[in-house]
Amino acid sequence: MKEILRRALTGVLYVIILLSAVFLNSDAFDFLFMVFGLACLYEFKRLTHLKGYYIFIAYLGLWWAYIYLVSDTTLITLLMLLTITINLALLAFLFSKKETPFNTVQKFIIGLFYIGGGCIFLTMIPYKHNGFSKFLIMGIFIIIWVSDTFAYFVGKSIGKTKLYPSVSPKKTIEGSIGGLVFALIAAYFLSLIHI
């Protein structure tokens, strides 16, 4: 019960902060996701024991350049390819038997493109047709929240088969399927609304 209450309160706070930023103005939204990126990098740095603050400087420089300066689709595509490549490499590493630790340069590159690249493209999502689409980004987050919420409740109620115990001991296959199904339902209803 305490865990559900904690999750609910955290979720409500998160929703309030996000809604405030989205509906205040585009600059507030940009700033919020820049800060989210810094927070994620701080946690990544702590978990991987990456020393120094160069990664924060590199992230801020990359974020600023791509959000406010770069408009060339070739450069944007290049960053996207780098980000996707790092994601696929991490996925392959996750399912491999290797236990070779990452060196400092690898940690830096992973943090910059896995986290930094992800935050940059997340920040870009609502900017379509030279405008700021509040409801597009809200629709995406609604789908994420629905998926997360129902994955939790389905997993708690009928979940038996562990998904990946060494990474997340409590997550189950049943919960993941439940989250996916309800996310698709939410996406369908949101598709009926023009955003």
Question: Regions from the language model: what does each represent?
Answer:
Residues 1-172, 176-192:
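Membrane-embedded alpha-helical bundles of polytopic integral membrane proteins
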